Amino acid sequence: MVVIVGGMIGIGKTTTSKMLGKETGLKVYYESVEGNKVLPLFYTSSKEEKEKYRYPFLLQLSFLRSRFHAIKEALKNDNAIMDRSIYEDYYFAKKNFELGNINEMEMDLYEGLLSEMMDELNLLPKKSPDVMVYLHGSFETVLNRIKERGRSFELDSELVSYYKFLYDGYDEWVHSSYKASPIISIDVDKKDIVYNESDKKEFLEELSKYNKIK
């Protein structure tokens, strides 16, 4: 079974993935944040530095590469919880293109690489995940959780408008463009599937419909 945990920055994907790994015994592939040298530069560099050094494009390539290798291994082994995945990667590239952080030539290159990677995944016996657990909540909740996890490079007040830009289109994109698997939608403002045992039990029962959890 391959389960993707998706949702906005800071919404609780890693915590949920860790819980799912413990409950199901599946291997957890965490988002490649630690050790990513480009990520803090993307958040902290000036507009001029971004334009000169192309940090937004480099970051997307970095994530695309790591997520491709992760989903490829996960699908081959059919035994994984994925903290974010290659399927949502395009959304972030698209939004940064809309903001002008990624130029047209870079976007064309990115889309070509992504298309080739998806073609390669389609050659595998298992071609897609079994289900996506989509975490969503209010924008206030997103901001609070970003602050709570305390990554210094994510906390600049000037980033709020960037987070809002991502947030405003996220839900629509997931429900209109994500086609790789069925979706289990969790409103984190209404349910706590990590720490509330009743909510967790209900969620795991729903998840078990996609594969038997022993």
Each model region followed by its residue ranges:
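Hydrophobic anchor at the beta1->P-loop junction of P-loop NTPases
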Residues: V5
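P-loop (Walker A) phosphate-binding loop of NTP-binding proteins
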Residues: M8
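Conserved lysine of the Walker
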Residues: K13
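Hydrophobic positions on the alpha1 helix immediately C-terminal to the Walker A/P-loop
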Residues: T16, L20
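Conserved substrate/cofactor phosphate-moiety recognition/catalytic segment
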Residues: K22-S66, A93
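A basic- and aromatic-enriched beta-loop-alpha substructure that forms the phosphate/nucleotide-
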Residues: S66-M105, L109-Y110
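A glycine- and Lys/Arg-enriched "phosphate-lid" helix/loop adjacent to the NTP-binding pocket
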Residues: F92-D168
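NTP-dependent small-molecule kinase module
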Residues: L143-K214
